[in-house]
Amino acid sequence: MRTSRSSVVMPLPVRHALRKLGRDIRDARRRRRIPAAIAAQRASISRTTLVKIEKGDPGVAIGIYATVLFVLGMADRLGDLAASKNDPVGLQLEEENLPQRIRVAPSPKRTKDK
């Protein structure tokens, strides 16, 4: 079996997440009773690329994944993946760095022109 370079250096949790995404896409397509050939045609990709997506292949561009999600009517949540509301670690770090007090900067002193 040939392994792509990206799957060799990719962290295990990321590989698992991509495989799960692929399975979820496959299951969503099946629930909608959309044959693979038609889903591929609607996404303007080959049937082979759709199979790769449904297996969670990391070599497929994220834009292609997004297009397939669009075909399935599921692209609306894609834009929220890294939104601040879904980032508890980032929100916690941001909260820890908030200043205790905010001071007004002194206005520059005017000098009299002679």
Regions inferred by a protein language model and the residue ranges of each:
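Short, charged recognition helix plus adjacent turn
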Residues: G79-K114
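Short, basic-rich loop-to-helix N-cap that marks the start of a DNA-contacting helix
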Residues: G56-F70
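A short, Lys/Arg-rich alpha-helix, primarily the initiator
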Residues: S6-R31
